[in-house]
Amino acid sequence: MKHLMKKITYIAALLALIMTCVLPLEAKTRRAVVIGLGEQLDKSWGKINGDKDVPLVVSMLKANGFSDIATLTNKNATKAGIVNAFNSLINRSRKGDIIYIQFSGHGQMMTDMNGDEKDGLDEAWIPYDAYLKYCSKDKGEKHLSDDEIAQYLTRLRSKIGSEGVIAVIVDACHSGDSTRDLCENDSVVIRGVDIDFVIPGERTKSSSRSTESWLTLSACQDFQLNQEYNGVGKLTHILVNNWRGFVGKSDQAIYNAIDAVYETRKYKGPIAQNPRLSGETGRVLSLIFNKK
């Protein structure tokens, strides 16, 4: 009997040891927030199809083991709605989690209020209730500037720790500069505007930029336009149709592969467009795309 009890005690201790090793691995949840806009409260914005990206991205994420996916489209993707989604994601996240965030919609350059940009302009995501021009209904508070986004991502990084990963995919365009004139085909849908959101008044003289401790993959370079492909975002279409080929590759190799696809006859549009990779790179995307 004593021998049996010792054996049971030994097995229980062994199981407890195994559980302490296994549980931390199981705790690494794959979480995502996917935002897409094809409608805007202010009808001055051009019609795009960012909302059509969302179901495609969700299917891709589910195929890669993501179990916690929040989506916001059109009227639900207000500034407050997006901020709430960020805060909820931060509250739910745990050490070591794998995070995917995507924004598909309009982008715009807006007045840099804290002086951290050399050109005096911040990049901003455009929520449903943001206006194209400064007005009484939107004095800039409805835009989601890159400074605000960085604050949420910094909090998220603190929550998941260095062992976690954050990938931010931006299928938008912030510039829409004079190269727009090169696109004479009215059937080409462009995500981006050539109007800066100008906030009157004095700005802070200077401020340091926060460290980007996450990976950002954008649909185009700062000076380029983002053209849609077959009614969805070009970057989104390429990701959902090619991610299986990204498994096990470095972020730079994945970027190179995406850039090469951009140049194929199938995707090459009337104006030049190349993706942009920035921030904390290494093997972030290979952890996102890990199912063969």
Q: Predicted segment positions?
A:
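Bacterial N-terminal signal peptides that target proteins for export
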Residues: K2-A12
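Cysteine endopeptidase catalytic domains of the caspase/legumain-like
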Residues: I18-K292
